[in-house]
Amino acid sequence: MSKSRDTEIKLFGRTITSLLDVNCYDPSSLSPVHDVSSDPSKEDSSSSSSSCSPTIGPIRVPVKKSEQESNKFKDPYILSDLNEPPKAVSEISSPRSSKNNCDQQSEITTTTTTSTTSGEKSTALKKPDKLIPCPRCESANTKFCYYNNYNVNQPRYFCRNCQRYWTAGGSMRNVPVGSGRRKNKGWPSSNHYLQVTSEDCDNNNSGTILSFGSSESSVTETGKHQSGDTAKISADSVSQENKSYQGFLPPQVMLPNNSSPWPYQWSPTGPNASFYPVPFYWGCTVPIYPTSETSSCLGKRSRDQTEGRINDTNTTITTTRARLVSESLRMNIEASKSAVWSKLPTKPEKKTQGFSLFNGFDTKGNSNRSSLVSETSHSLQANPAAMSRAMNFRESMQQ
């Protein structure tokens, strides 16, 4: 009796299932057995394709003739006929590979055709002989640069007159050539990068800021320095000079209520030279106006009342008019007086009737006070601010 069973074949790690009805007892149902190795002509072909072939060595497979054709299309790895030479795996899967080969060949042909057409176009593009005038300034001083990358019909031109690029059939660029400061250094359009110094300004009338004459706000000198010459800082002359500096801010701005723009009396009185083309005047200071008569700060005492001042000749000078004396100028005078008094062996016998900064130097029988006068006068005469604070402190201690 014949028995049917399923057999599994493993080739190269892959299982192949097939229905093989094998009847070992019925010799009539078996097909003649073919020996692959018996034919010497086919042995060479089998040995050459043994690396890719699923069959290794001579195989004896008894198969029915009726099932031979039915199992032919089930799996490509099953040999359909032993009479034919075995095929490789690449040859079995030939439909897909043939399609890929066709696609590759078509791509190669398209690339060759495009390369030939591009070569023809590149040879066809030539520099135009006719120059197009600039549409902006209508000058004929133009230059052909190159063809547009996207459209061959729009070449790029450059105008040497107005320094602009434009494309034929397109819009013109309003941006000049270059990237700002590096390219525009030699062009007249780069004047806004220049910095105007004080030498470029018209300083012909700058000498009239200081004028000499008598005024209510004049700076007077007392003692040895009292002569007929007085220096005046006029605000009207400063306001008249604003017309000569066109394009700049005024060097001094007058504030309302006679207030000073600087909060401290030792601040610099001139403007910054890097912003305003106005030279410094180190000998002149801005007058400080008094805020109240009872103020205890230095440099802000009113002089409306008549006061008695003593100079080196011990003669009193009465002032009937209100005068504003510069603080730094007064400090220099008083420092020179203190230096002269410290060198003298005796102190002045008379005391000032009015309020004076040098009441602290008057001796009251204390021997240490005389030594302090000689020491502080030499050490503090270089710094008027520190000397005035020390004197004010001593006056307050005596009171």
From Swiss-Prot:
Region (Disordered): 29-125, 212-232
Primary subcellular site in the record, as a coarse category: nucleus
One GO term of the biological process aspect: negative regulation of short-day photoperiodism, flowering
Record: residues binding Zn(2+): C134, C137, C159, C162
Keyword Cell wall biogenesis/degradation listed: no
Mutant phenotype after disruption: Early flowering.
Composition bias, Low complexity: 109-118
Keywords from the UniProt entry: DNA-binding, Flowering, Metal-binding, Nucleus, Transcription, Transcription regulation, Zinc, Zinc-finger
Record-level Gene Ontology MF annotations: DNA binding; DNA-binding transcription factor activity; zinc ion binding
Domain of life: Eukaryota
Pfam families associated with the record: Zn_ribbon_Dof
UniProt induction comment: Circadian-regulation. Highly expressed at the beginning of the light period, then decreases, reaching a minimum between 16 and 29 hours after dawn before rising again at the end of the day.
Residue ranges with Polar residues bias: 91-108, 212-221
Biased composition (Basic and acidic residues): 36-45, 64-75
Biological function: Transcription factor that binds specifically to a 5'-AA[AG]G-3' consensus core sequence. Regulates a photoperiodic flowering response. Transcriptional repressor of 'CONSTANS' expression.
Protein name, UniProt field: Cyclic dof factor 5
Species the sequence originates in: Arabidopsis thaliana (Mouse-ear cress)
Gene transcribed to yield this protein: CDF5
